């Protein structure tokens, strides 16, 4: 078992960290945990989202005829998570933090902290995401390029709307604590 943490803020540094894991440590899977803003009304602060897939909501080559989110030159721009890891993570969540809602859905990533309703609605309507954050899709892309199963796990810290900055500070610690409980159980099951 190898756990790695990256405090880098930009998506390319996350890809590099994932590539290092693939190249030098020959990892069997990549599991990334963190926090995110909810894009759905039924997903509340403290709940957990397990990625079914991930994509970059701020990739925009529409001037060249691409759909929003499509990465030019890539055959795939939506990266599918491992069903086996999703199943194991769901069981670990329900066992370790049964009081939380556990959702399976799309994680969308972009180089921005979403904190207004208009941006939230645009991202939700265009990309059908369950939550938004900054690095999951970059990690998923690197895992895909290396043919490594992956899972992105996000504890919800805010509602990605006008209250996001206030919610984030208040709920960040709780969201992280829930992620740690679940991750410990998941690693034990793998």
Language-model regions, residue ranges each:
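Mid-sequence, gly/pro-rich, charge-dense loop/helix-turn segments that line enzyme active sites
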Residues: 39-127
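His/Asp/Glu-rich mid-to-C-terminal helical/loop segments that flank catalytic regions of hydrolases
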Residues: 160-190
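Single conserved hydrophobic/aromatic residue that forms the stacking wall/gate
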Residues: 1-8, 12
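A C-terminal functional module that forms or caps the active site or interfaces directly
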Residues: 112-159, 165
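Short, well-structured alpha-helical segments in soluble
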Residues: 17-25
């Amino acid at each position: 078992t190898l756990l790695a943490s990256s405090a880098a803020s930009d998506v390319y540094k996350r890809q590099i960290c994932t590539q290092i894991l693939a190249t030098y440590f020959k990892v069997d899977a990549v599991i990334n945990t963190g926090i995110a803003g909810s894009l759905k009304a039924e997903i509340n602060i403290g709940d957990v989202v397990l990625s079914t897939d991930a994509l970059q909501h701020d990739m925009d080559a529409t001037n060249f005829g691409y759909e929003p989110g499509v990465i030019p030159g890539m055959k795939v721009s939506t990266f599918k998570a491992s069903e086996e890891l999703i199943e194991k993570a769901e069981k670990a969540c329900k066992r370790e933090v049964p009081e939380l809602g556990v959702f399976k859905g799309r994680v969308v990533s972009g180089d921005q902290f979403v904190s207004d309703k208009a941006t939230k609605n645009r991202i939700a309507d265009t990309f059908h995401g369950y939550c938004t954050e900054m690095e999951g899709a970059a990690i998923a892309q690197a895992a895909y390029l290396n043919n490594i199963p992956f899972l992105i796990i996000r504890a919800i810290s805010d509602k990605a709307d006008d209250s996001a900055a206030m919610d984030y500070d208040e709920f960040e610690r709780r969201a992280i604590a829930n992620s740690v409980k679940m991750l410990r159980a998941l690693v034990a099951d793998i």
